Swiss-Prot record:
Residues 93-211 are annotated as: Interaction with NANOG. This is Steroid hormone receptor ERR2. The gene is ESRRB. Acetylated by PCAF/KAT2 (in vitro). It is linked to Deafness, autosomal recessive, 35: A form of non-syndromic deafness characterized by non-progressive, prelingual hearing loss.
Amino acid sequence: MSSDDRHLGSSCGSFIKTEPSSPSSGIDALSHHSPSGSSDASGGFGLALGTHANGLDSPPMFAGAGLGGTPCRKSYEDCASGIMEDSAIKCEYMLNAIPKRLCLVCGDIASGYHYGVASCEACKAFFKRTIQGNIEYSCPATNECEITKRRRKSCQACRFMKCLKVGMLKEGVRLDRVRGGRQKYKRRLDSESSPYLSLQISPPAKKPLTKIVSYLLVAEPDKLYAMPPPGMPEGDIKALTTLCDLADRELVVIIGWAKHIPGFSSLSLGDQMSLLQSAWMEILILGIVYRSLPYDDKLVYAEDYIMDEEHSRLAGLLELYRAILQLVRRYKKLKVEKEEFVTLKALALANSDSMYIEDLEAVQKLQDLLHEALQDYELSQRHEEPWRTGKLLLTLPLLRQTAAKAVQHFYSVKLQGKVPMHKLFLEMLEAKV
């Protein structure tokens, strides 16, 4: 049994990819597969504690209920109040109006999570046949065929590219009964894609990813959208209002993401809260940095909200813009890959500087697990760069410094009282000051 296998256990719950939704929809946003509802409807800082074991190819998501049945509702009891004296944060839990899930490839009803993605049996089988059979397809048209339930058989090439695009993991397919291996198959990159954003079938020379890294890839949340208030005049207030609302919605997503980090849910509730309260801004900034890698001197706060130097100056964010851009340039120089990014993000959470950890040994084990996962990845995939792990880890202090600047800036915005802030963002901001 590998070191990854020993630590995975039941902490790797399922993760449902989501679509953007209006922040005004509150808790109803969940019924549209969206994590984008603000925190006000859910009562502030919450950790969804109930997890179940789920691998890359999981059982059906709704045991004991038909996919077309009535949405199930489940309430959770209030849990312990916050650790920090300056921020008595109460946890409230609610899982509201869970809809039936759709296959991310063709839109049919999903039967479960297959190879890391909610998908139907037909697309699951198609992806498996393609990988195990070492099959290459050719599109008779322009590689842009629409893949729907009715038309999914019309073009195998575009269907396979769609499987890759939504994130199906090659590591989930068993190859031990097939001679040879897979041919290198690169999906066509769309206009917004880049080497930083694509997840491709790798050449046979590359070794399989460790399970930890594979699970972190699966746990990655879907894109969020800023959706700036349309009626508000352009200026610093609109920019700050947009970013504060976006940060609040991202925090809701981060809390759900954290419990899918192998080993995190086994920590005590108090330690989970302490780590999140300490590292949330680092995680937010690391996301901005990674999204900004394909761009020159621009920060991608969200897919629909990109700020250059002039925009940042008008918003009063020039100092923060320059600090984050310094990180972007550093990661760009390292040519950081998505597998490294997701592991560094988990490490930023586990390596937080919280003074309120109850079980230091348990947190240390989580840190060791993630350090080992990063090191194993570098040894197997980037063995020609023996010092790469150290170089990546040395970016974390600068990330922490940048996060501290961001916290101070938004706390000063809070004190001015000119920009509305949602409950969760306020609580987490006060916990850091």
